Every structure is written in structure tokens, then in C-alpha cells.
């Protein structure tokens, strides 16, 4: 009899096809997030669970899932999973790093360039017919933006995605600064990147890109004090987690001109709507789509499947998050 896996949202078929060879597979069929009470019911007879960032996977879920042995999170981050509690119970937790690195770094640059050059404003101006109504074919002062080439970029969080952002910055001839919990000598050499304390990075950067995981230490690490350290011409890009930035402080910074603009792919709560923030012209907004390319999402689905299949075969999953769990229970559904 095959072990059973429940997938909380439809993922690309390549991953599901791989899983069907080894598991009894059930997929939540709706686009909306699975209701909490339904999730708690569905996990009662599953051996494995594929989850999204939007689901809170905690002790309550584990209490309702007596057979659960592994949680495969369809994301590189895993702040939605109580990893410590999972480890205590011998439940393996995996994620999907690497396969979404380039897509997410590309999107950081999409936000950076679009914000710097006021792309959404210009698109709206053109699409609405305002350009035609004004009757001005070209004007020296129309939609002036900020130069990118040769400027200074500060990257907060210098893991895979942060370094991928930096590689792209090299092509723009930029000075690259970074801040991280630990220094990265090899990356510094490869990318000609300079390690800076957070305050110095904020003061010196023309563009600040957030690429840190959400932890107790990074919660609201960018608040009023930090935003006031930035240049009034600087642009903030957040591809990390919404809670890394104090939203109320950011709104104030954008309205009062402490910084020039922001590009946001993540928010403190998701889905999200904030009329005050969303009415501002100097911010570009996206609904958490940093990894939303066909290649990245298919790669994530394949990695989810590889993790679960490895576990089923009694092997340590390739991208195991809680490595200490192997001391609690060996991999496998035995």
C-alpha cells in the first residue's frame, strides 16, 4: 500500500506525476487557501504533507496528524512551519532552495528598475489616454527617474538569492555592499562585494534590496530609524518577507520623502490591501510572485517530489531543513 500525501494547493503537474508513482496523492482542488478546519481534517490520515507559505503548520496540525512523518514546504522559506516542534516529534521538514534563486533575483531587478524608472506610472499615463489628452509628444522633464548604472546597491541578506542579485548588479557596473549575519569571503572575492554594518549600508546605498529570511532578529529590522538613515533618493526593494519591514514606517517614509520609492513583492499579511500604501505613486506592488516563472515553479515541484521520494526510500531528503531530526527518527514510513 502506498503512503498518502496531501498537497494543499495545485502545483505543476511534473511534480504530481512523479509523486503518483510512489504515493497515493490528493490535491486541494480550489485556488483559494485551504480553510484551517479542512486542513485539520485532511491531515488525519496522511503520511506526508506538501504545504504553502500561507498555511500555518504547527502543533495543532501535528496533533491531528498521527501518521505524518514529513512536511515538504513548497518554498525556500519555512517560517510558516514550527520546525522546532516538528523536530521534537520526529517529523522531517524540507524546502525548495536553489531552483527559485534566479527567478527571484530577476524579479528583484524587475522591481528595482521599474521603480527607478517609474514604469507603472508611465504605463498608466499612456494606457489611460492621458498622454494623448495632454497633447505633449515629448518633454525634457516627463517621468524623470533615477539612474541605476554605476550606482551603489546594498543587499541585506547574502545567501543564494542575495548573491544572485549581486551578480546582476555587476552587469550594471554597480558598487556592491552587503550585510549578513556572517561574512562571505568567497562571495566577496567573486562579486567584489564589500561587507558593511547595517547602518553604513543604509547610509551609502542608492538601492537597498532585502533578501533575508524572517526570524525573530529580522522582524521589522527596517523601521523608522533605518528608513531615516537612507538617502532621500534611495529605493527600497523587498523580496524577503513582509514582516521584515515596518509597514507603517514605510508609508511615512514614502509620503514624507525620507526615501524616493519602494518595490514590494511581500507584505506583513497576505493577501493584503492597505489603501494608504496602495494609493502612493512612488511604490510598486506585486502579489508575492518573485519565483513565478514556469521554470522555477516546475523546479520547485520536482524538488518537493524528490524530497518525498528520497524519504520514502529511507534516505535523508536532499533539502532537509531540520537536520537534527535524523537523531530522533530515521527517514522512511516504517
Swiss-Prot record:
An MF annotation (GO) of this entry: glyoxylate reductase (NADPH) activity
E.C. designation(s): 1.1.1.26
InterPro entries assigned to the protein according to its UniProt record, in alphabetical order: Ado_hCys_hydrolase_NAD-bd, D-isomer_2-hydroxyacid_DH, D-isomer_2_OHA_DH_cat_dom, D-isomer_DH_CS, D-isomer_DH_CS1, D-isomer_DH_NAD-bd, Glyoxylate_reductase_GyaR, NAD(P)-bd_dom_sf
The reaction(s) this protein catalyses: glycolate + NAD(+) = glyoxylate + NADH + H(+)
Subcellular locations according to the entry: Cytoplasm
Keyword check for NAD: yes
A Pfam family that the UniProt record links to this protein: 2-Hacid_dh
Major localisation: cytoplasm
CDD domains xrefs: GDH
GO cellular component, one term: cytosol
Binding site for NADP(+): 158-161, 180-182, 239-241, 288-290
PROSITE patterns associated with the record: D_2_HYDROXYACID_DH_1, D_2_HYDROXYACID_DH_3
HAMAP family: GyaR (MF_00776)
Name of the molecule in the record: Glyoxylate reductase
Organism encoding this protein: Thermococcus gammatolerans (strain DSM 15229 / JCM 11827 / EJ3)
Amino acid at each position: 500500500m502506498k503512503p498518502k500525501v496531501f498537497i494543499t494547493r495545485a502545483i505543476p503537474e511534473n511534480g504530481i506525476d512523479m509523486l503518483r508513482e510512489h504515493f497515493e496523492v490528493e490535491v486541494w482542488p480550489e485556488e483559494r487557501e485551504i480553510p484551517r478546519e479542512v486542513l485539520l481534517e485532511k491531515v488525519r490520515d496522511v503520511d506526508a504533507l506538501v504545504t504553502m507559505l500561507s498555511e500555518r503548520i504547527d502543533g495543532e496540525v501535528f496533533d491531528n496528524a498521527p501518521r505524518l512523518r514529513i512536511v515538504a514546504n513548497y518554498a525556500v522559506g519555512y517560517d510558516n512551519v514550527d520546525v522546532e516542534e516538528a523536530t521534537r516529534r520526529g517529523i522531517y521538514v524540507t524546502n525548495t532552495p536553489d531552483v527559485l534563486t534566479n527567478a527571484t533575483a530577476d524579479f528583484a531587478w524587475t522591481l528595482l528598475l521599474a521603480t527607478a524608472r517609474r514604469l507603472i506610472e508611465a504605463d498608466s499615463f499612456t494606457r489611460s489616454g492621458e498622454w494623448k489628452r495632454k497633447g505633449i509628444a515629448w518633454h525634457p522633464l516627463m517621468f524623470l527617474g533615477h539612474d541605476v548604472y554605476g550606482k551603489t546597491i546594498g543587499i541585506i541578506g547574502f545567501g543564494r538569492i542575495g548573491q544572485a542579485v549581486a551578480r546582476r548588479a555587476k552587469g550594471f557596473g554597480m558598487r556592491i555592499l552587503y550585510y549578513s549575519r556572517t561574512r562571505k569571503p568567497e562571495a566577496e572575492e567573486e562579486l567584489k562585494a564589500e561587507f558593511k554594518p547595517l547602518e553604513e549600508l543604509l547610509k551609502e546605498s542608492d538601492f537597498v534590496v532585502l533578501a533575508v529570511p524572517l526570524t525573530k532578529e529580522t522582524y521589522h529590522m527596517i523601521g523608522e530609524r533605518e528608513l531615516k538613515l537612507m538617502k532621500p533618493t534611495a529605493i527600497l526593494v523587498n523580496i524577503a518577507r513582509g514582516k521584515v519591514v515596518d509597514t507603517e514606517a514605510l508609508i511615512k517614509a514614502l509620503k514624507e520623502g525620507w526615501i524616493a520609492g519602494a518595490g514590494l513583492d511581500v507584505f506583513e499579511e497576505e493577501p493584503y490591501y492597505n489603501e494608504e500604501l496602495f494609493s502612493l505613486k512612488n511604490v510598486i506592488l506585486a502579489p508575492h510572485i518573485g519565483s513565478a516563472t514556469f521554470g522555477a515553479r516546475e523546479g520547485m515541484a520536482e524538488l518537493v517530489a524528490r524530497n518525498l521520494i528520497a524519504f520514502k526510500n529511507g534516505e535523508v531528503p536532499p533539502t532537509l531543513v531540520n537536520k537534527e531530526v535524523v537523531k530522533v527518527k530515521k527517514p522512511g514510513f516504517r
